[in-house]
């Protein structure tokens, strides 16, 4: 059956990390799909940029996620085979902290509940195996061999390329003004045209508040800053020798990844400075107060990586 002009089975607003994946999978199933992205593809707005993203199976936030993560691993491997480029890098992950902290104990609980492979290592054992780690006495780490990272920018591009191959349609630099659910389906008005669809997926990240009124009181964007610091001892921070980590330091959760593409190890702090913002009011300029907590953590707990900051970037 030939579809009517400007009518689709599904319209997806926002072709970032999740929107590109939805476009790919729906087009692969034979649906007529239109993806609308207000920026370039890929772009450095929102939260999709940054070269790499952590992936692990012991999902502490809720053990019910674990079966979904198993499926995600399968899907990433399939996309990697179709694309012919390395996307999924499994060199291990470490969740570290003091033994009485929730992140540490909760991760062990999830691993045990779902029969995931793991080891518990003291701080000195972590340092002996992975010299880039120099955590304090009394800290322990849960090492998961099947954790690692995704080449997130490449993943987004791979999803978009394969969606095109599957017959999907994607428009970059096309801002959506409004949408409405009608008796006959969905109507989407962009700055360029009007489209209709049977279904709508909104994956607009921090811009979703502008499209879904109910989210305005329940989903508040925060300003985040990531840093890349060059190692004094580069071999200790390559992916094969430096597992990705989440670690609680003085009550503050930090995360980090090995040196990949950007000349430096990547480090961030969950919620950073806890600054609520909006896409329109985001202060995109990193400042000394943004850099300081990242450098302090790196210099104290990963001292081989205390060179001058190579890059700071903001996101939502």
List where the protein language model places each region.
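Predominantly flavin-linked oxidoreductase catalytic cores and closely associated redox partners
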Residues: 150-235
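Flavin (FAD/FMN) cofactor-binding and adjacent substrate-gating region
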Residues: 78, 98-167, 171-172, 178-184, ...
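N-terminal Rossmann-fold NAD(P) dinucleotide-binding loop
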Residues: 19-20
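Active-site substrate-recognition segment that forms the wall
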Residues: 23-28, 84-88, 194, 199, ...
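Dinucleotide-binding Rossmann-like beta1-alpha1 core, especially the glycine-rich loop
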Residues: 52-129, 254
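Beta1/beta-strand and adjacent pyrophosphate-binding region of the FAD-binding site
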Residues: 3-16
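Glycine-rich FAD pyrophosphate-binding loop
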Residues: 27-48
């Amino acid at each position: 059956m030939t579809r009517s002009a400007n009518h689709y089975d599904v319209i997806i607003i926002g072709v970032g990390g999740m929107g590109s994946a939805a476009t790919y999978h729906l087009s692969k199933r034979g649906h007529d799909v239109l993806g609308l992205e207000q920026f370039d593809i890929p772009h450095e707005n929102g939260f999709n940029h940054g070269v790499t993203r952590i992936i692990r199976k012991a999902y502490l936030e809720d053990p019910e996620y674990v079966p979904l993560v198993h499926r995600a691993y399968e899907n990433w491997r399939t996309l990697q085979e179709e694309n012919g480029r390395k996307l999924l890098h499994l060199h291990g992950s470490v969740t570290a902290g003091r033994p009485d902290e929730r992140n540490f104990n909760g991760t062990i609980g999830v691993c045990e509940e779902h029969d995931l492979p793991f080891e518990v290592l003291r701080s000195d054992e972590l340092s002996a195996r992975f010299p880039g780690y120099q955590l304090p006495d009394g800290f322990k780490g849960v090492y998961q061999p099947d954790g690692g990272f995704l080449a997130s920018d490449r993943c987004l591009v791979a999803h978009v390329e394969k969606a095109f191959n599957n017959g999907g349609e994607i428009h970059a630099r096309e801002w959506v003004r409004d949408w409405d659910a009608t008796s006959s389906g969905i109507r989407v008005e962009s700055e360029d045209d009007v489209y209709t669809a049977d279904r709508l997926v909104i994956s607009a990240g921090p811009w979703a508040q502008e499209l879904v009124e109910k989210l305005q009181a329940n989903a508040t964007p925060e300003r985040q800053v990531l840093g890349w610091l060059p190692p004094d001892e580069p071999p200790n921070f390559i992916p094969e020798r430096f597992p990705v980590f989440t670690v609680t330091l003085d009550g503050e959760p930090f995360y980090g990844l090995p040196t990949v593409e950007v000349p430096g190890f990547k480090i961030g702090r969950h919620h950073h400075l806890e600054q609520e913002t909006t896409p329109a009011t985001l202060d995109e300029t990193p400042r000394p107060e943004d850099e300081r907590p990242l450098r302090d953590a790196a210099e104290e707990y990963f001292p081989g990586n205390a060179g001058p900051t190579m890059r700071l970037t903001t996101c939502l």
